[in-house]
Protein backbone atom coordinates (compact mmCIF):
# COMPACT_ATOMS: atom_id res chain seq x y z
CA UNK A 1 0.00 0.00 0.00
CA UNK A 2 1.39 3.38 -0.96
CA UNK A 3 0.09 6.50 0.78
CA UNK A 4 0.80 9.87 -0.76
CA UNK A 5 1.98 12.65 1.54
CA UNK A 6 -1.12 14.69 0.71
CA UNK A 7 -3.35 11.80 1.85
CA UNK A 8 -1.86 11.47 5.35
CA UNK A 9 -3.82 12.79 8.31
CA UNK A 10 -0.79 14.66 9.69
CA UNK A 11 -2.73 16.15 12.61
CA UNK A 12 -3.53 12.73 14.04
CA UNK A 13 -0.25 10.85 13.58
CA UNK A 14 0.87 9.12 16.76
CA UNK A 15 3.59 6.64 17.70
CA UNK A 16 1.65 3.47 16.92
CA UNK A 17 3.06 1.03 14.37
CA UNK A 18 2.37 1.75 10.73
CA UNK A 19 3.55 -0.82 8.23
CA UNK A 20 5.36 0.70 5.27
CA UNK A 21 6.28 -0.72 1.88
CA UNK A 22 9.98 -0.77 2.79
CA UNK A 23 12.23 -0.68 5.85
CA UNK A 24 15.76 0.71 5.91
CA UNK A 25 18.33 -1.58 7.51
CA UNK A 26 21.92 -0.70 8.37
CA UNK A 27 24.42 -2.68 10.44
CA UNK A 28 27.05 -1.34 12.83
CA UNK A 29 30.26 -3.36 12.88
CA UNK A 30 33.87 -2.61 13.77
CA UNK A 31 33.04 0.97 14.73
CA UNK A 32 31.20 1.96 11.56
CA UNK A 33 27.78 1.76 9.92
CA UNK A 34 27.50 0.08 6.53
CA UNK A 35 25.70 1.76 3.61
CA UNK A 36 22.42 0.03 4.50
CA UNK A 37 19.62 -0.95 2.16
CA UNK A 38 15.87 -0.92 1.70
CA UNK A 39 14.06 -4.20 2.31
CA UNK A 40 10.49 -5.48 2.15
CA UNK A 41 11.23 -7.92 5.00
CA UNK A 42 9.82 -6.31 8.13
CA UNK A 43 11.10 -8.95 10.55
CA UNK A 44 14.11 -8.58 12.81
CA UNK A 45 16.40 -11.17 14.35
CA UNK A 46 17.35 -10.90 18.01
CA UNK A 47 19.98 -12.88 19.83
CA UNK A 48 18.75 -14.90 22.81
CA UNK A 49 21.27 -12.84 24.78
CA UNK A 50 19.63 -9.54 23.79
CA UNK A 51 19.15 -7.35 26.83
CA UNK A 52 15.50 -6.77 25.99
CA UNK A 53 14.82 -10.31 27.17
CA UNK A 54 16.63 -9.76 30.44
CA UNK A 55 14.89 -6.76 32.04
CA UNK A 56 17.42 -4.30 30.67
CA UNK A 57 17.37 -0.55 30.74
CA UNK A 58 15.85 1.22 27.80
CA UNK A 59 15.11 4.78 26.79
CA UNK A 60 12.51 6.05 24.35
CA UNK A 61 12.33 9.58 23.04
CA UNK A 62 9.99 10.35 20.19
CA UNK A 63 11.16 12.93 17.68
CA UNK A 64 8.38 14.26 15.46
CA UNK A 65 8.66 15.91 12.07
CA UNK A 66 6.05 18.30 10.69
CA UNK A 67 5.28 19.81 7.30
CA UNK A 68 5.19 23.61 7.24
CA UNK A 69 2.84 25.77 5.19
CA UNK A 70 5.49 26.11 2.47
CA UNK A 71 5.92 22.31 2.26
CA UNK A 72 9.21 22.09 4.15
CA UNK A 73 9.64 19.28 6.64
CA UNK A 74 10.96 20.36 10.03
CA UNK A 75 11.71 18.55 13.29
CA UNK A 76 10.30 19.95 16.51
CA UNK A 77 13.13 20.91 18.88
CA UNK A 78 15.60 18.15 17.93
CA UNK A 79 18.26 19.66 20.20
CA UNK A 80 15.98 19.35 23.23
CA UNK A 81 15.00 15.83 22.17
CA UNK A 82 18.67 14.81 21.97
CA UNK A 83 19.33 16.33 25.41
CA UNK A 84 16.38 14.42 26.93
CA UNK A 85 17.71 11.20 25.41
CA UNK A 86 21.19 11.87 26.80
CA UNK A 87 19.79 12.78 30.23
CA UNK A 88 17.67 9.62 30.33
CA UNK A 89 20.61 7.46 29.28
CA UNK A 90 22.81 9.06 31.93
CA UNK A 91 20.20 8.38 34.64
CA UNK A 92 20.20 4.72 33.64
CA UNK A 93 24.01 4.62 33.47
CA UNK A 94 23.86 3.85 29.77
CA UNK A 95 26.53 6.36 28.69
Mark where each language-model region is.
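Conserved alpha/beta cores of soluble small-molecule-handling proteins
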Residues: 1-95
